[in-house]
Swiss-Prot record:
The keyword rRNA-binding does not apply. This is Restriction inhibitor protein ral. One of its GO terms (biological process) is symbiont-mediated suppression of host innate immune response. The keyword Nucleotide-binding does not apply. Belongs to the lambda phage ral family. Pfam families: Ral. Keywords: Host-virus interaction, Inhibition of host innate immune response by virus, Restriction-modification system evasion by virus, Viral immunoevasion. Ral interferes with the cleavage of DNA by E.coli EcoK restriction-modification system, by modifying the activity of the host methylase. This modulation allows incoming, unmodified phages to escape the host's restriction system.
């Protein structure tokens, strides 16, 4: 059985968020169009890359939120 994943169709179901400025980073590179076999397992490099990108941005948001919370504690 062959499965084809159209990343353009997949991404198209989500609203594009331009707030994080990562839209160009989320684009699928030609070498990432299909999962590849590595060490006997299928690996989706696009999914790994975009998950890391999202985690990085969420970490930045959490750091900023923590910084703002620490500032508001001193204001009280």
């Amino acid at each position: 059985m062959t499965t084809t994943i159209d990343k353009n169709q997949w991404c198209g179901q989500f609203k594009r968020c331009n707030g994080c400025k990562l839209q160009s980073e989320c684009m699928v590179k030609p070498e990432e169009m299909f999962p590849v076999m590595e060490d006997g397992k299928y690996v989706d490099k696009w999914a790994i890359r975009t998950t890391a990108m999202i985690a990085r941005e969420l970490g930045k948001q959490l750091d900023e939120d923590a910084r703002l919370c620490s500032l508001s504690v001193f204001d009280a």
